[in-house]
Amino acid sequence: MKLCRFAPAGGAVALGIVEGEEIVDLSPVDVPAEPAAALDEVGQEALERLAERAPRLGLSDAQLLAPATPHKYLGIALNYADHIAEMGMEAPEVPVFFNKQVTCVVGPGADIHMPRVSTFLDYEAELAVVIGKRCRHVPVEQAPEVIAGYTAANDVSVRDWQGRAQTMTIGKSFDTHGPLGPWLVTADELGDPQDLRIRCFVDDDLRQDASTGEMVFDCFQQVSHLSEAFTLEPGDVIATGTPAGVGIGRQPIRDNLLHVGDTVRVEIEGIGELVNTVVEEPEGFVAQSLPAC
């Protein structure tokens, strides 16, 4: 099942089920608009029954929004061997996580802002895990039971701000620098999350091309590790790392970073495309509250 958050023309944010080129509109029924919460509170089978008599609209007639509204957005660094090599670093012995502030989240088609304070803007294609159950101390073998599904992420990074801080959070958390989408694919439909092709294009230039099977720490290990420290909640997002090919890993670096007008396309097998375009940061921009993004 592919679940989305969307806003029909002139309408409020609603939950939808994507089927081909249509959205099954679940706004007439009393279900959460957030996919992970709907799966947790209503259940997938009940959503399928509700969809049988729900109205439909075309994908092109709705604005797709980020398919998760996380309380916590976490990312892992240095989780593909080829990316570790291109950065000239050594593989970590334990997962290295950082926070992305949730006000960075935007959906498919939204603009990525070139900050007024930097032009060292970079892309990172990533598979994102969306948590589906409130959980703590999850064994690796039980991690699939607490995952609602998966989506595509672009862990947009401001490299100079990232590099001069003791933690990566500030360089990873600028407003609009957390695109997610286009929808959440439930775990049962996606299958093995460690056997997916992941690619990133800047305009039509292929920059990243790898398999999620190349992760150092797989999705289930990441969920388990984080849950040892703190409670994970439905809708929380874990960006599971990026492969080689990021702009800062290419020469000349300046030419391979993002520029105003560039369109970034993250493609993940079994999920789809997440497309966003870089624009100048608008004067006076303030991020919307998360449910509206």
PLM features: what roles do these ranges have?
Residues 90-108, 123, 259-270:
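Structural signature of FAD isoalloxazine-binding scaffolds in flavoprotein oxidoreductases
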Residues 4, 63-65, 86-88, 112-121, ...:
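A generic local secondary-structure boundary/capping motif
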